[in-house]
Amino acid sequence: MMIQTACRILLLAMALWMSGPALAEDTPSNLTAPDQQAIHQVIQSQLDAFQRDDAAAAYSYATPMIREKFGDARNFLQMVKQGYTPVYRPKSVDFDKLVDTEYGPDQILHVIGPDGHAYTAHYMMQKQTDGTWMINGCYLTRAEDQNV
């Protein structure tokens, strides 16, 4: 029950966040090449952790705000298993563009889920005070016209 409530809160927050006007600028000018590489690496590392069912590692790439919402790595991984199957067990992942929004960088990925359907994953990134990048949320949309 707690996981379902947390998932609903996270999904509602992401929906509200996305409903605001966003500035979409390809390849954010305020991000250095090392920042862009770090963002890619953080997301790939979390995807790799999901493949290993390494809850602690996957959880470590989430921002403190996200970690606080789920309480521990086990709850976080359970939420991903239930609500984000395409990124939990993707058949394929292709990194697309990194766009700048008024809420921060959004790394777009094209994912083929285990069901064979195509999805677009938006990874919202946040730079921490120590200079590292962490995942501040993810939302998925299904590409209705693309099945594999």
Residue spans for each PLM region:
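Bacterial N-terminal signal peptides that target proteins for export
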Residues: 1-10
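Bacterial N-terminal signal peptides
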Residues: 9-19
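Exposed beta-sheet edge and beta->alpha loop/turn motif
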Residues: 97-148
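Short, low-complexity N-terminal intrinsically disordered segments enriched in polar/charged residues
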Residues: 23-52
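Short solvent-exposed beta->alpha transition segments
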Residues: 30, 37-41, 55-102
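A generic structural signal for ordered secondary structure
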Residues: 45-49, 72-76, 135
